[in-house]
Amino acid sequence: MCGRTSCHLPRDVLTRACAYQDRRGQQRLPEWRDPDKYCPSYNKSPQSNSPVLLSRLHFVKDADSSERIIAPMRWGLVPSWFKESDPSKLQFNTTNCRNDTIMEKRSFKVPLGKGRRCVVLADGFYEWQRCQGTNQRQPYFIYFPQIKTEKSGSIGAADSPENWGKVWDNWRLLTMAGIFDCWEPPEGGDVLYSYTIITVDSCKGLSDIHHRMPAILDGEEAVSKWLDFGKVSTQEALKLIHPTENITFHAVSSVVNNSRNNTPECLAPVDLVVRKELKASGSSQRMLQWLATKSPKKEDSKTPQKEESDVPQWSSQFLQKSPLPTKRGTAGLLEQWLKREKEEEPVAKRPYSQ
């Protein structure tokens, strides 16, 4: 499933990250609809507004269906046939839509049949792994692998307007397949646009964290076909819905557990072996206290760093570890990215405690 995302880029930067080629091969930037409704956040939850890509043909008659618009929409699809005056009274969860029942449930089948396909944009999404033998859950941040280019020497470049058409080598946004719908209040008022994220069985790399994952559209061709309802039929588009292995992840702090927390700390990598945020009792607690006294609290430049093999074998049962090795190259790029943003932006507010 997918119940929390990060999408923190400023509006103009997000626009450049979504540059594309139209059907004529021309490089373009998507237009915005209701741009003031977009609110960047490191910690987006259902019922908040998130940016989605969709075909311009949904809003402009006779437009080229390959042209794109970015529109902030409510996360959690409100069906067009919903009769209540308050969308929060919807009695079922539409945050996600399973791919194996998408053509069975009216809430999703109807808008899909109308071509209401969208691409949900995010830095990445969060998922929680249940820790065996405890009530704790470890959060992870999941995203596309990031590549450092020779041109930039980092993960940020193309800062000036004249360069956006030539290269975008900043953070690669995660592009998730979604369905949207339009709901009109029975008593009149503004139309509410809302969406759901399609989910599939997890790929092998994520199966230890959760058994479901978003349907990720990997690459420009997949994104174009999913959006272009004028040229690509529903049956053809659904062939794009499947798990992808082109994904990476790292453990993050429990700060993200509280959806009110909106700081870079939400997606910053943490080391599960070093952190040891565990609950224990009795003799287990005393063992953990002993381990804490034997481990240096701060790395000393004169003290050689211990390798993981130096940890006593019997203590491994008390140390949480990632089920799969994190790709440190990608995590390192993320840390550089966060460090640069921290230097450029005001200091974030102190996180709320869970």
UniProtKB/Swiss-Prot annotation:
GO molecular function, one term: single-stranded DNA binding
Biased composition (Basic and acidic residues): 296-309, 337-348
Any one Pfam family match given in the protein's UniProt record, by short name: SRAP
Tagged with keyword DNA-binding: yes
Catalytic residue list: 2 (nucleophile), 127
A single GO BP: proteolysis
Subcellular location: Chromosome
Record's comment on post-translational modification: Ubiquitinated; the covalent HMCES DNA-protein cross-link is ubiquitinated, leading to its degradation by the proteasome.
Regulation of this protein's activity per its record: Formation and reversal of DNA-protein cross-link depends on DNA context. Catalyzes formation of the thiazolidine linkage in presence of abasic sites in single-stranded DNA. Mediates the reversal of the thiazolidine cross-link in presence of double stranded DNA.
Site positions for Required to stabilize abasic sites: 210
One GO cellular component term noted in the UniProt record for this chain: replication fork
Record PTM Phosphoserine, positions in chain: 160, 295, 322
Function: Sensor of abasic sites in single-stranded DNA (ssDNA) required to preserve genome integrity by promoting error-free repair of abasic sites. Acts as an enzyme that recognizes and binds abasic sites in ssDNA at replication forks and chemically modifies the lesion by forming a covalent cross-link with DNA: forms a stable thiazolidine linkage between a ring-opened abasic site and the alpha-amino and sulfhydryl substituents of its N-terminal catalytic cysteine residue.
Entry comment, domain topic: The N-terminal catalytic Cys-2 residue forms a thiazolidine linkage to a ring-opened DNA abasic site. Glu-127 catalyzes reversal of the thiazolidine linkage; self-reversal is favoured by duplex DNA formation. Glu-127 is also involved in sensing abasic sites in single-stranded DNA (ssDNA). His-210 stabilizes the abasic sites by forming a hydrogen bond with the O4' hydroxyl group.
The protein's name in its UniProt record: Abasic site processing protein HMCES
